[in-house]
């Protein structure tokens, strides 16, 4: 029997964990920012990769852009390519001026999409490094708050069921997080200490990424070694016993070899939530060979260890006489209330090693091979609260009876009675799960691709092709409580449950959760193999008009087994699924100038139900193994304009996204299931980013959505209703201004707004979370060219907002908090 775990206590912060740094960006050639806040950058034309990176302090930034193209145009007869670049020589150098805040001039970050965001025919939101630095971003979740259409169901500081879980344009993207173009299979909360910038590719993108990407894909571009030496250390401290240190060292070893090391130590409580904390550390060394050469290779290792308390927030309740449920905190219950037990914990250890090879074989052909192996370990135990009014004899009531939570069956009515203190909340979600588990995964992926640029007569081509092989396996061992997990007070909860014992699943087999089609099982094993082939051709009929068409073929083969427990009552089960999919895309681009593009894009994506091997405890059941995959189609027309010598980037996109056989995620277990729902989200997305005036940076986005359930395939959906978690309106804005740059009394002041309209929490549109409004601010000062101090303030008016959203509960966001930061850069 596993011993009862003591209450988790905050460890004192170790000075060793604070040795540390936010990084100088990766760059092949560095350039120094001018007094206007713009940056000179060297552009190298020849190879089909684009790398844009920035590093800045208080509005002063360094940017380096390497944009590479080539063709076979003879010397003396040079013609501008689709990007407006003369490419009659393979290594032409041109100097341009760009703002490090201009998202359009950032790379997407993967070889299969070799152009920058400006020249990619799809709406792409890029969170540049200078923005993350000014906001003191510490996690992927915090970075993505700058992107419209992103909703977190689990995120940094809020904890939750399965690490980072995001929705893009209202659709699940839990398996659509990539790092340098390779899928990150891990289930953990991602720290941002090794980030250069983050790209969000909106809309179905299976032609590039393979299965998944219904709403889009998130691609993290990490810091990479570069020529030249750079050293930076950073320390933050503030509200919530917050202590954080980061380190970034880049060392040039030879004229073509460089080494880089980034590290992080972080300990914090969550302001505005009781007992929630995160203790984590990470390290990411990398070495690059062949910098500036025709053949280069980058080897990277990443490790992150995280011990945190998961937070399932507060329950939704229904006031008598009102049909719409709201978070219980909207009726005066304290936002700090946490309904977990001393057993709750989320401990993860994640390791990845990545190799990226680039070979410029000839002026017209470049080959890439990217490979990654990952090992992920996790122990997870959480309490999921529910406050309901249940009728005796129902399944929900009986589950409460089994788990000793009978008082919670009348929690809702008790709360609105004359004696609200009598309300008791269940800690098992009212449906008995999920049980604690230990998870071990490993994965491997290899993507080989080539980019060829050539002419057939007077028509130019850019052909991208290759193959993608990925394999992932997951093993879970469940645990069971030997006694009842009793309910607790809704108004004054306690984490202590006297006599509660957690044991091995074989010790208490009858205490396991009974999953339909699976039973009460002890061990769960799953694996999946995906083999994909992709090919596309962009054809320039004139210097300004081009058409790109492509497809990807995938074969997805997965298996799932549930074994152990009381096999006499619940026999072992074994399921499998084999899906072959073809996903096309077609784009039309009109580029009258290198800084202006108007485009149309049509693309499709496919998501097999068995795809979520590491993200779900039951990736397959008897019902879902034969279910058709989810299909999505995107129609998008947009324009991108980089104005005033690339100082300001502006985008506008109109889109319609249709999805059939919608996948739904169980709010308690995280298991996925198919319905015959058909959904449509259509709308408008706008963005502007860059340097508006000398020393004045701005980053703003807006989204207008019309998310509709066009066909309800089950009684839990409302035909004509609004898709859950998707607001009609959403906007973000951040601005900063540098006063008296390079003067002893210099100062940078900044601030921002995050606004999201209220959203429905379920497909039936019976529960709703109110609008989110958050005001943040920043002030910084530079002592010289090396030292900087800053103060960041978050949620200045201490508004009760909700970050992570579920169908029957929500997690309050952080309260008002302040972080002091000091950094040194040499």
Residues covered by each model-derived region:
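Acidic, small-polar-rich N-terminal luminal/periplasmic segments of exported/outer-membrane proteins
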Residues: 55, 65, 85, 89-228, ...
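Outer-membrane beta-barrel translocator/receptor signature
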Residues: 193-196, 207-285, 291-295, 351, ...
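Repeated loop/turn-to-beta-strand initiation elements of outer-membrane beta-barrel proteins
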Residues: 256-259, 294-297, 364-367, 458, ...
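Acidic/polar loop-and-plug regions of large Gram-negative outer-membrane beta-barrel proteins
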Residues: 268-271, 283-360, 364, 374-441, ...
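Structural signature of Gram-negative outer-membrane beta-barrels, strongest in the C-terminal barrel
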Residues: 288-292, 441, 460-472, 524-659, ...
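Membrane-embedded beta-barrel scaffold of Gram-negative outer-membrane proteins
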Residues: 360, 366-372, 376-378, 382, ...
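Gram-negative outer-membrane beta-barrel transporters
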Residues: 543, 656-658, 674-763, 797
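C-terminal beta-signal and adjacent terminal beta-strands/loops
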Residues: 754-762, 768, 780-826
């Amino acid at each position: 029997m596993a011993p009862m775990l003591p209450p988790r206590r905050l460890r004192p912060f170790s000075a060793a964990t604070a040795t540390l740094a936010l990084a100088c960006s990766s760059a092949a050639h560095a350039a120094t920012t001018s007094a206007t806040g713009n940056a000179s950058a060297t552009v190298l034309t020849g190879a089909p990769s684009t790398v844009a990176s920035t590093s800045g302090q208080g509005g002063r930034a360094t940017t380096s852009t390497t944009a590479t193209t080539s063709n076979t145009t003879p010397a003396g007869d040079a013609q501008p390519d689709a990007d407006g670049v003369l490419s009659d020589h393979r290594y032409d150098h041109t100097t341009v001026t760009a703002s490090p805040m201009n998202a359009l001039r950032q790379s997407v970050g993967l070889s299969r999409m070799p152009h920058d965001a400006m020249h990619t025919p799809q709406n792409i939101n890029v969170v540049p490094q200078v923005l993350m630095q000014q906001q003191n971003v510490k996690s992927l979740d915090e970075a993505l708050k700058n992107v419209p259409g992103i909703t977190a169901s689990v995120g940094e500081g809020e904890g939750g069921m399965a690490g980072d879980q995001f929705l893009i344009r209202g659709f699940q993207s839990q398996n659509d997080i990539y790092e340098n173009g390779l899928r990150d299979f891990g289930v953990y909360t991602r720290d941002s200490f090794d980030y250069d910038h983050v790209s969000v590719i909106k809309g179905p993108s299976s032609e590039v990424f393979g299965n998944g990407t219904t709403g889009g894909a998130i691609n993290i571009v990490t810091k990479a070694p570069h020529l030249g030496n750079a050293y930076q250390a950073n320390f933050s401290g503030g509200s919530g016993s917050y202590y954080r240190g980061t380190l970034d060292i880049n060392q040039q070893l030879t004229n073509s070899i460089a080494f880089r090391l980034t590290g992080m130590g972080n300990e914090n409580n969550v302001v505005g939530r009781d007992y929630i904390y995160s203790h984590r550390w990470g390290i990411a060394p990398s070495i690059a060979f062949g910098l500036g050469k025709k053949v280069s290779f980058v080897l990277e290792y990443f490790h992150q260890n995280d011990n945190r308390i998961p937070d399932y927030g507060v329950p939704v309740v229904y006031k008598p006489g009102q049909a719409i449920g709201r978070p219980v905190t909207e009726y005066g219950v304290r936002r700090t209330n946490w309904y977990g037990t001393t057993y709750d914990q989320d401990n993860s250890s994640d390791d990845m090693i990545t190799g990226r090879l680039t070979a410029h074989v000839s002026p017209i052909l470049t080959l890439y091979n990217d490979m990654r192996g990952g090992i992920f370990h996790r122990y997870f135990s959480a309490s999921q609260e529910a406050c309901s009014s249940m009728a005796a004899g129902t399944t929900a009531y009986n589950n409460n009876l089994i788990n000793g939570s009978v008082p919670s069956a009348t929690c809702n009515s008790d709360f609105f009675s004359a004696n609200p203190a009598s309300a008791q909340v269940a800690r098992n979600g009212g449906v008995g799960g999920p049980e604690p588990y230990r998870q071990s995964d490993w994965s491997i992926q290899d993507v080989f691709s080539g980019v060829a640029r050539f002419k057939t007569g007077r028509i130019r081509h850019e052909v991208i092709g290759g193959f993608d092989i990925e394999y992932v396996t997951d093993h879970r061992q469940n645990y069971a409580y030997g006694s009842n997990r009793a309910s607790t007070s809704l108004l004054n909860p306690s984490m202590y449950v006297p006599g509660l014992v957690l044991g091995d699943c074989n010790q208490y087999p009858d205490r396991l959760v009974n999953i339909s089609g699976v039973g009460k099982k002890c061990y769960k094993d799953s694996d999946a193999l995906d083999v994909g082939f992709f090919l596309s051709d962009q054809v320039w009929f004139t210097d300004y008009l081009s058409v790109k068409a492509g497809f990807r073929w995938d074969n997805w083969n997965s298996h799932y087994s549930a074994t152990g427990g009381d096999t006499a009552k619940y026999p072992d089960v074994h399921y499998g699924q084999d899906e072959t999919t073809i996903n096309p895309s077609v784009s039309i681009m009109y580029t009258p100038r290198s800084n202006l593009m108007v485009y149309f894009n049509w693309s499709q994506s496919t998501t097999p139900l068995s795809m979520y091997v590491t993200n779900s405890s039951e990736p397959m059941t008897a019902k879902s193994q034969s279910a058709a995959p989810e299909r999505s189609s995107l129609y998008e027309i947009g324009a991108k304009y980089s104005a005033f010598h690339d100082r300001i980037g502006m985008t506008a996109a109109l889109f319609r996204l249709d999805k059939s056989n919608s996948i739904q995620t169980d709010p308690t277990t995280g298991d996925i299931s198919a319905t015959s729902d058909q959904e449509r989200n259509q709308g408008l997305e706008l963005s502007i980013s860059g340097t508006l005036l000398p020393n004045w940076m701005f980053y703003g986005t807006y989204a207008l959505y019309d998310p509709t359930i066009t066909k309800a395939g089950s009684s839990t959906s409302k035909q004509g209703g609004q898709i859950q978690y998707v607001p009609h309106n959403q906007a973000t804005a951040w601005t900063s201004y540098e006063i008296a740059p390079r003067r002893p009394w210099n100062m940078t002041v900044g601030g921002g707004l995050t606004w999201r309209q209220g959203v429905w929490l379920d497909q039936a549109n019976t529960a709703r979370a109110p609008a989110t409004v958050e005001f943040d601010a920043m002030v910084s000062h530079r002592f010289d060219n090396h030292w900087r101090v800053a103060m960041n303030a978050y949620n200045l008016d201490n508004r009760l907002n909700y970050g992570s959203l579920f169908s029957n509960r929500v997690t309050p966001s952080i309260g008002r908090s302040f972080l002091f930061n000091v950094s040194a850069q040499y």
